[in-house]
């Protein structure tokens, strides 16, 4: 299972970094099933102010997948928000992870800084960290373990 967040058009870096390998895997016969997710719900965690952009990019990403050689006859391409069980599973997982553990996650800490989020009283000019963004790793875990 793999996927992309539809935050913009895919580019050469996506092709070299993962799309080429996905096409090779789909054609290798090595796996019975290959699932490729367009992670629109995760894209909203830091694009909630522009859901139309995410919606439009779902179409762009799907077209890019097809143009790179991904074949819907050989792999399952799906949109994250269209599988409600993923959200349900993430909700259950959220009861197994503490806020403190998420706060210690180096990737979460780095992403919060990069996006200018802050829950610190001294940084009132910055916007707070959205809960959906903060719990992004839990959502990813549910996506992976569901498949």
Question: How should these model regions be labeled?
Answer:
Residues 1-147:
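NTP-dependent nucleotidyl-transfer catalytic core
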């Amino acid at each position: 299972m793999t996927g992309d967040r539809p935050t913009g058009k895919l580019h050469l870096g996506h092709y070299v970094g993962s799309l080429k390998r996905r096409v090779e895997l789909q054609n290798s016969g090595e796996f019975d099933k290959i699932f490729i997710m367009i992670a629109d719900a995760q894209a909203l965690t830091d694009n909630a102010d522009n859901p139309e952009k995410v919606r439009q990019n779902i179409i762009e990403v799907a077209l890019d997948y097809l143009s790179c050689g991904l074949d819907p006859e050989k792999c399952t391409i799906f949109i994250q928000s269209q599988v409600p069980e993923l959200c349900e599973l993430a909700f259950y997982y959220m009861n197994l992870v503490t806020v403190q553990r998420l706060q210690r996650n180096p990737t979460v800490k780095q992403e919060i800084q990069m996006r200018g989020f802050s829950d610190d009283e001294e940084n009132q000019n910055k916007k707070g960290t959205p809960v959906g963004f903060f719990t992004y790793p839990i959502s990813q875990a549910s996506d992976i373990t569901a498949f």
